[in-house]
C-alpha cells in the first residue's frame, strides 16, 4: 500500500511538472504566433528568465525545468534566451559537459566566439577528446583569427581521424593563414596524390609556391587550373601575377584581361572599381621584384573604359 501511495505521489508530481511546462509553452506560442498577438503586451519581450519573477520563482527555479526550457528555446533558435536559462541552471547544480556544450553553442550562434570558447574549454575538461567539441572550438578560434589554437584543435581531430581529407584541407588552409606555406603546400600535395579536392588543392599549391617565390612551380599549377571548366577571376588574376613576375608580360596581360572580364560580371558590388583586386595585390608584386612604375604602366594598359 505504501509503495503504491509513493508511486501515486511521484506520478502526481510529474503530472504537475508537465502541466507547468505545457502551460508556459502554450503561453509562449500564443504571444509569439497568434494572429492578434500585437494587441497584447508580450511578457516574453521583457526579461525572458521567468525565475526572476517572484510569483514564478518557487515553481520554476529548478535545474531540470531550466534545462528543459533552454532546450525548448534552442530548438527554436532563441539562443540568447536559452543562455539565460542554462546559466541560471548552472548556479544551482554541478556543471556537466552537455549543459556546457549547449551554453557554448548558443554563444557561438550569437556571434560571441570568445565566450563560446570559455564554455567549450570547460566541456572539454569534462569530456576530453570529444570530436564535436573540438570541431566547434576550431571554428571559434578561426572566427577570432587565433590560428595557432585552431591548428591545435585540427591536429587533435586528425589524430582521431587519420587520412580524413576534409581535415587535411582545413589544416592546410590554417597553415596558410599562419604563413607556413611549405607545410601548407605539403598538405595539398597529399590531397592531390589522393585525388581528392584536386582543383582547390591546385589553387592552394599554386599560391603557396607563389608566396615562397617558386614561380615556375606556381606557373605550372596555374596552367593546369586554367585548363579546367570552372575558372574564376581570382585564377586569372593570380596566373597573371605569376606570369608577369616570370617576365611573361604578354601572357600576363591576357590573363589580366580575362580576370577583368569575369570580375565585371561576378563582383558583388557594381560600384567596386574593376582594378581594385589588382591594386590589393600591389604589395605581393613589389615583393616579387616589380616596382611602382611597372605597376602603374600595367594599370594604364589594363584600365577599362568607363562603364556606362
Range-by-range predicted roles:
Residues 241-267, 295:
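TPR/TPR-like (Sel1-like) alpha-helical repeat modules
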Residues 1-127:
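Alpha-solenoid helical-repeat scaffolds
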Amino acid at each position: 500500500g505504501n509503495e503504491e501511495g509513493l508511486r501515486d505521489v511521484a506520478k502526481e508530481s510529474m503530472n504537475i511538472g508537465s502541466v507547468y511546462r505545457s502551460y508556459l509553452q502554450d503561453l509562449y506560442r500564443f504571444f509569439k504566433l497568434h494572429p492578434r498577438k500585437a494587441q497584447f503586451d508580450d511578457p516574453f519581450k521583457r526579461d525572458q528568465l521567468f525565475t526572476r519573477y517572484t510569483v514564478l520563482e518557487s515553481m520554476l527555479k529548478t535545474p531540470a525545468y531550466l534545462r528543459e526550457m533552454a532546450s525548448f528555446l534552442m530548438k527554436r533558435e532563441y539562443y540568447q534566451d536559452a543562455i539565460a536559462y542554462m546559466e541560471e541552471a548552472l548556479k544551482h547544480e554541478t556543471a556537466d559537459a552537455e549543459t556546457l556544450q549547449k551554453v557554448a553553442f548558443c554563444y557561438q550562434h550569437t556571434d560571441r566566439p570568445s565566450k563560446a570558447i570559455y564554455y567549450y574549454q570547460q566541456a572539454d575538461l569534462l569530456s576530453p577528446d570529444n570530436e564535436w567539441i573540438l570541431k566547434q572550438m576550431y571554428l571559434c578560434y578561426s572566427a577570432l583569427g587565433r590560428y595557432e589554437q585552431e591548428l591545435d584543435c585540427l591536429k587533435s581531430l586528425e589524430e582521431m581521424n587519420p587520412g580524413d581529407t576534409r581535415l587535411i584541407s582545413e589544416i592546410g588552409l590554417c597553415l596558410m593563414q599562419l604563413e607556413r606555406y611549405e607545410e601548407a603546400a605539403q598538405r595539398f600535395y597529399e590531397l592531390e596524390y589522393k585525388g581528392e579536392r584536386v582543383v582547390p588543392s591546385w589553387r592552394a599549391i599554386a599560391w603557396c609556391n607563389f608566396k615562397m617565390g617558386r614561380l615556375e612551380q606556381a606557373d605550372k599549377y596555374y596552367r593546369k587550373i586554367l585548363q579546367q571548366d570552372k575558372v574564376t577571376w581570382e585564377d586569372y588574376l593570380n596566373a597573371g601575377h605569376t606570369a608577369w613576375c616570370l617576365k611573361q608580360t604578354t601572357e600576363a596581360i591576357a590573363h589580366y584581361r580575362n580576370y577583368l572580364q569575369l570580375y565585371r560580371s561576378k563582383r558583388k558590388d557594381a560600384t567596386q572599381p574593376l582594378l581594385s583586386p589588382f591594386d590589393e595585390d600591389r604589395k605581393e608584386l613589389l615583393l616579387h621584384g616589380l616596382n611602382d612604375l611597372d605597376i602603374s604602366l600595367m594599370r594604364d594598359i589594363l584600365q577599362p573604359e568607363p562603364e556606362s
